[in-house]
Amino acid sequence: AVAFLRFMRLGDGRLARFNGVSVASPAGLATVLAYDDLFAKPLASARPSGYVNLRRGATTIIADAGVPPPFEFANAAHAGCLSFEMSAGARLLFVNGGAPASSDQDWRPQARGTASHNTMCVNETSSAKLVRHRGLEAMIGGAPIRGPLEVKSTLEEANGDLVWTASHNGYLGRFGLIHHRKMTLSASGAAIRGIDRLTGDETPLRLKSDLPYAIHFHLHPEI
């Protein structure tokens, strides 16, 4: 568990803001990590969780390529599939909205939406559906999300570069679209390249009308 916390830490010492994580004190996290074995090998991957970590030079990128958890654990999950956060040294560059503070819970539905994350949003619609059911919400403490049902993700090394390729079908049922994302972090960590695509499932897709989309990149407030 401690190794996973280290895996999810950005250059400023804080955890990446995915699925209900908010801004926390790096000192508190450092205290927990102090109990880790100093000679333990760091996690190279965290495949069961769906999270991906790209580190080269002073650059760190952490991305979410997992499906939502089961309903009973999804009351704080966000619709941020294929979103990422990025730091250069100790400076945060791109960040997700994260969970709002306890005094700002009215913003929680918006914070959980796809538009609050560094990823593509189609037709101003989140890639996951918020399931509103009074009894279910009372039982698990909030409205869970459902979807995407399938997320594919690979992380490979090519001549020192790290290449992350992923896709999700969160927009397939509503719009017939699959979101593909490819990000390459150079061997030095000084350059990043990215490509986002929308395709049909298997056969060529002809849309009945134009669909707006936006690729969100949320800069950290200090940039």
Segments the model singles out, each with a brief description of its role:
Residues 157-222:
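Acidic, contiguous internal or C-terminal segments within carbohydrate-active enzymes
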Residues 56-58, 64-67, 86-88, 95-99, ...:
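Active-site proximal loops enriched in glycine and acidic residues that flank catalytic Cys/His/Asp
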Residues 28, 72-75, 103-108, 132-133, ...:
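A short, polar/proline- and glycine-enriched secondary-structure boundary/capping micro-motif
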Residues 79-150:
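Active-site rim segments in enzyme catalytic domains, especially the processed small/beta chain
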Residues 46-48, 78-80, 114, 175-179, ...:
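Residues that act as N-cap/strand-start positions at coil-to-secondary-structure junctions
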